[in-house]
Regions:
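Short alpha-helix plus adjacent loop in nuclease-associated cores
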Residues: 69-77, 228-235, 262-263, 351-374, ...
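Conserved helicase C-terminal RecA-like lobe
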Residues: 138-141, 321, 335-347, 360, ...
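Conserved phosphate/pyrophosphate-binding and hydrolysis machinery centered on Walker-type P-loop NTPases
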Residues: 36, 88-92, 108-116, 138-145, ...
Length: 564
């Protein structure tokens, strides 16, 4: 079943009621239902609504994102693929660090092969389920592509050595698992007899294949989407998945939801006018019973700073509650002038897509300790904290450890265990041994049931000397960083209290999968500044579209590439 759901047409309500209908009217075991959304925030909202709607068994319904679903499956079965189940999930910064190591190992010229471009090629390959070996085979006769393929191979080797996966691996490895382990696939086909997918227009080839495999046995598949809202092609989304749904799943039915409950007719008329000429779209016209509503206001200004000032002054003069206002723009670079105006007029604001909380140095440091405790093979985590805070293990000693590890096919942590065997370490060997003792002590404590993540973080901060080093940096700096660590402790405490069988690995997984938008609290009285891509699916009373000009909205690149 394909539900073509226009914007604001109540698609989440449809999915929630379908789940309730299956459980209460059709006596389907909730354990056999899988509902996939695209953000943790959407998954949480759907889970809450299912709980309100269904009178029993709602907790057994598996509601999560594609990535969370795959992580849960891989945590149980990834040993079939040669990994350990306590694998680490690498974020973008971690990927960049690994790529720098790969370039060094292979002596790659970063001017000829820009890291960012190569990482994009690898990500696209994984979205298309192309392995390094297949990439190399396809690259025959093209020296540039052959080099990219070899970089891809070495990158994957480094990840596996660290017992780590990147985001794109999560889905690709799950598909690989299902294709190579029929018994595992059969288990999940039996488990998930009723599958529902939200935002289907945003799926890529790997996600399509995952759904195809899971639904292959019982074919009880319901997807909800809107080809008019397909805005993630730059992330690998394939609009063909929704446009060709009836061809991919024979006998499929299509239902259209065209009544909009969110907007006024004037807004819908403008949207319909813009979208109606899209190539290959499925025909539908949104309508509403909300009335015509006010006309869309258009304001022409000469300079970007004038535009920013106009928007902020307008919010002030109209007296709008700040939390009901959002300013949307095409690129993150446009936020600077808007931020400056908010500061000048003393308007509280939140910037979605700014520095992610989990990317802050002190947070990454503490998480690196936790990752090392969880997965000693994670060389990135170990390398980050081996001398943080400073404990007298300098760059020369670390280089000797790294060389020894590579020569003996050891992880960095394993090499540290053998510090006494490595010549030239001198006094650093004792300091390395004390670091190992600290980590092993924490591992021992984590085996005690009563020892919580809150205690672990507090003990890491105190016993590693992290707090003391922060305080040496200055009172103001220490206070700010400790406040952030306090927020991490709050997050860990909430997870610990709200989870049935909490584990360190699952907490790290939850943190690694969190997106910027998941942390958005619309109840805070602040003006929201965000890109259009971040705003998808959100609602605000007052919306300002900035930078509606030639070459910017849509971008010059989109026009030239023919993607419009």
């Amino acid at each position: 079943l394909l539900v073509l759901a226009g914007a604001g047409s109540g698609k989440t309500r449809v999915l929630v009621h379908r789940i309730a209908y299956l459980i209460e009217e059709k006596q389907v075991n909730p354990w056999n239902i899988l509902a996939i959304t695209f953000t943790n925030k959407a998954a949480g909202e759907m889970r809450d609504r299912v709980n309100q709607q269904v009178h029993f068994g709602a907790d057994s319904v598996w509601v999560s994102t594609f990535h969370s679903t795959c992580v849960r499956i891989l945590r149980r079965h990834i040993e079939f693929l040669g990994y350990e189940t306590n694998f680490t999930i690498y974020d973008t910064d971690d990927q960049k660090t690994v790529m720098k190591q790969v370039y060094k190992i292979m002596d790659v010229d970063s001017k000829l092969y820009k890291e960012r471009d190569v990482m994009a090629h690898i990500s696209n390959a994984k979205d298309e389920l192309i392995t390094p070996e297949e990439y190399l085979k396809n690259a025959q006769g093209d020296i540039h592509e052959q080099t990219v393929a070899k970089i891809y191979q070495e990158y994957q080797r480094c990840l596996k050595k660290n017992n780590a996966l990147d985001f794109d691996d999560l889905i690709m490895k799950t598909v690989q698992l299902f294709r190579t382990q029929p018994m595992v696939l059969d288990f999940y086909q039996e488990r998930f007899r009723y599958i529902m997918i939200d935002e289907y227009q945003d799926t890529n080839k790997a996600q399509f294949e995952l759904v195809h495999l899971l639904a292959g046995k019982y074919k009880n598949l319901c997807v909800v989407g809107d080809d008019d809202q397909s805005i993630y092609r730059f992330r690998g989304a394939d609009i063909g998945n929704i446009l060709n749904f009836e061809d991919s799943f024979s006998g499929a039915k299509v239902v259209k939801l065209e009544q909009n409950y969110r907007s006024t007719q004037n807004i819908l008329d403008a949207a319909n006018l813009v979208i109606r000429n899209n190539r290959g779209r499925k025909d539908k016209t949104l309508w509403t019973s909300n009335g015509k509503g006010p006309l869309i206001h258009f304001q022409r200004l000469d300079q970007a700073y004038e535009e920013a000032e106009f928007i902020i002054r307008d919010i002030l003069s109209k007296g709008y509650p700040y939390q009901e206002c959002v300013v949307l723009y095409r690129t993150n670079a446009q936020s600077r002038l808007l931020e400056e105006q908010c500061i000048q007029f003393n308007i509280p604001y939140r910037l979605v897509g700014g520095v992610n909380f989990y990317q802050r140095k002190e947070i990454k440091d503490i998480l690196a300790y936790m990752k090392t405790i969880s997965n000693g093979r994670d060389d990135l985590a170990v390398g980050r904290i081996i001398n943080v805070p400073k404990r007298g293990i300098g760059a020369t000693s670390i280089a000797k450890l790294t060389t020894f590890a590579a020569a003996n096919n050891n992880s960095l942590y394993d090499a540290m265990h053998k510090a006494g065997e490595i010549s030239g370490l001198g006094k650093a060997a004792d300091k390395i041994s004390r670091f190992i003792e600290l980590i092993e002590d924490f591992r021992g404590r984590m085996k005690q049931k009563e020892y919580s993540l809150r205690q672990l973080i507090e003990d890491i901060v105190e016993e590693s000397g992290y707090r003391a080093e922060l305080e040496n940096e200055g009172e103001e700096e220490a206070e700010s960083r400790m406040e952030n660590i306090g927020e991490l402790i709050n997050k860990a405490t909430s997870y610990w209290n709200d989870t049935k069988n909490p584990t360190l690995e699952e907490f790290l997984e939850e943190v690694s999968l969190v997106a910027d938008i998941d942390q958005l609290d619309q109840r805070e009285n602040r003006v929201t500044l965000m890109t259009l891509h971040s705003a998808k699916g959100l609602e605000f009373e007052n919306v300002y579209l900035s930078g509606m000009e030639e070459g910017l909205f849509p971008s010059y690149m989109a026009v030239m590439s023919g993607d419009l």
